[in-house]
Each structure stands twice: as C-alpha cells, then as structure tokens.
A protein has these predicted regions:
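Secretory targeting and sorting signals
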Residues: 1-31
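Generic detector of short, well-ordered, non-transmembrane alpha-helical segments enriched
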Residues: 25-27, 68, 224, 307
C-alpha cells in the first residue's frame, strides 16, 4: 500500500508433510493470564482497518471509538535508513518502539476489549530498503525487534506487508521468515501468545508468483503464519473492474494456492486463513476501480458465508465522504457516504 505504501501459513514442515497451525495459531497456547491483553486471542472474525501512522491528527483511541473499530492495523513500522536494525513508527526516529510512542492510546483500546496489529513494511519501506528484513541482515536482530514490539505493547498479532521491491528480495524474504520462526520459538519458551500475518498484493486470479514464493519460503523456514491478507485493489489493469467479483475470485485463487502448500489443512481452515483488505471508494488507479458502499455490504455477507477470518481496509482516516470524485485520496474515500460507513458495515462482519 502506498505510503501507504496489509492459523496459517506458517506451517511446520516435518519431512515431506506440512502441518498447518491455524485457528489458535499461537506460539504458546497456554500464554498468560486474562489480565494481559496479549493473552486474549483474536476473535474468530476480525475487522481491523489500517490506521495511517503518518497522519496522527486524530489519535488511535479516538478514531477507534468514533468509527466503532475495536481492532486497528497500524501502518507502518520501518527503519530510518537502509542498513539499520532499529524500527520506528513511520521510520521516524522520534517514535521508537516504546511506551512513550502510542502506548497510552493502545492501552485504552485494549481496555475497551480491542487491540492493535502493528504492520511492518508497506509500499514506501518496500521501495526504499527500509523494511526491517530488507534493511537488517541479522536474523536475531530482526527477531529481537519483533519481540520488543510484543513485550512493549502486548499485541496479539504482527503483520508483515510485503510489496514492490521487497517481493524480489529473496535474502530479505528468508531473513523475515527465519525471524518469525525464531520469535515464535521465543514466545513459546516465555509462554506468550503471538501470531504473524502476511499482507500481499494480488491479481483477481490470486497471489502473484512472487507472493506465493513468500509463503513457500515460510513453510521451508518453519514459520507459522496465521493469516494471508490480500490487497484487493490497485490492480492497474487498465479496464473497468468489478471490485466484488475481483475480491471473490482473488480469494478463490488464494484458496487454491494455499491448498497446494498445505494439503493437510481442511477447507474451513484455509478459508479462515484468508484476509481481505479493500480500499473504500476510488483507489489509486481511478474511477474504474471503485469499491462502493453497496460493494461493502456484499463483501461483508460473502466473507461471513465463506468463513473469512479477517477484513481490513485502507485506511480508517479515509472513511468519510469529504471528496466525491477524487481518486486515491488519503483523507477521504472519493465517494458519497456517511462518516464511518465502511467501518460500520465491516464491524457487523466481525460481530
């Protein structure tokens, strides 16, 4: 996702058999007490729209309350410069992984029964070698960053948004998956609960070959992945798209791809592993790729029927009708809508 730039895959391979760790795909299922937000698993269906960390004019807790979205995906974490092994929110050195950076807002969201899903990468990081796995060549150092995020904010899941140049960085892909496996082993040893998800670009037919290779490497490295989240927008195919049909066919394609990677998994497990991220209104391509208010209702019902585990969208700050006809706006959807329309529709999916 532009400057945007978002228990499966992570299956453990034993011999020639990949065993899928889904559902409670957690490292350390006995983790914690009920008083620790990290000890609470994510609900069976999660709605977690992206919050743009570079636009904090309205705080996390406030937008969560206004929109009704109990879970937020936080975009993004990245290094300040290539070669660094230190991650910051939006790559801003004044915003380290520390309680002083958004800790109070996250605690408020957790006290209300929700949580946040921090996301690494995104389009900007992935095109500037500042995604942590592209920037840092030490797998233990990458894992330590993941562990710090878990212990600092008590999060239930970490998302890894891999796009653009990062999809071709095979060394970075392998480091990332090794670091996931290392973090999961650390979590199990410390009786902590954690999940990892991948957010990947898609065609209407499913993952690109590069996206599929990311998951194949996860299996090889023994990394457990709880969700694969498809970016079902910005196709740039040059034709008018049926965004509902494209979402459904992309998910069908991913299902087939996952089944080939994880033949031991049930259909229900595979569908529950699939996540969908829409871009409400007019996306970056333009009016030919418009996700309408009616589309949102259709997708929410379809996702419930299919057993989809996650719905998200880009991004919470856009969930208003302030700029009808504008494509790819960062603060409004480009279509006429009531404030928080898409959030309310997709929150019903989660409930």
């Amino acid at each position: 996702m532009k400057r945007r730039k978002a228990t499966l895959l992570a299956a453990l391979a034993a011999g020639t058999t990949a065993l899928l760790a889904l559902g409670a795909a957690t490292a350390g299922a006995s983790a914690g007490t009920g008083h620790d937000p990290a000890s609470r698993p994510l609900p069976d269906r999660v709605f977690a729209p992206y919050y743009e960390m570079y636009d904090t004019s309205t705080g996390l807790a406030s937008l969560s309350q206004q929109s009704g979205a109990r879970y937020l995906s936080l975009a993004f974490l990245q290094t300040a410069a290539p070669g660094s092994c230190t991650a910051y929110w939006d790559g801003d050195t004044s915003q380290p992984i520390a309680p002083s950076s958004y800790g109070s807002d996250i605690a408020v969201i957790q006290a209300r029964g929700g949580n946040v899903i921090p996301s690494f990468g995104g389009y900007t990081a992935d095109t500037t070698s500042t995604d942590i796995a592209d920037s840092c060549t030490s797998v233990p150092a990458i894992a330590q960053v993941y562990e710090s995020l878990i212990t600092t904010y008590s999060v239930p899941r970490i998302d890894l948004d891999v796009e653009a140049d990062s999809l071709a960085n095979t060394a970075g892909i392998d480091r990332r998956n090794q670091a996931i496996a290392m973090t999961e082993a650390w979590a199990a040893a410390h009786h902590r609960r954690i999940e990892f998800s991948y957010t990947l670009p898609t065609f209407p037919s499913g993952l690109t070959s590069a996206g599929y290779a990311v998951l194949r490497n996860a299996v090889a490295d023994g990394a457990r992945i709880a969700a694969v989240n498809l970016l079902t927008f910005d196709y740039y195919l040059g034709t008018q798209q049926d965004m509902v049909a494209d979402t459904e066919s992309a998910a069908d394609g991913l299902f087939t791809q996952l089944r080939s990677l994880y033949p031991a998994a049930t259909a229900r497990q595979l569908w529950h592993t699939i996540g969908i991220t829409e871009m409400p209104g007019i996306d970056d391509f333009g009016p030919d790729e418009t996700f309408s208010t009616a589309d949102a209702v259709t997708i929410a019902h379809w996702a419930q029927r299919q057993g989809i585990g996650l719905i998200s969208f880009w991004a919470l700050q856009r969930d208003n009708g302030g700029c009808p006809g504008t494509k790819g706006a960062g603060t409004c959807s480009g279509v006429s809508q009531p404030d928080w329309y898409f959030s309310h529709v997709f929150e019903h999916f989660a409930n």
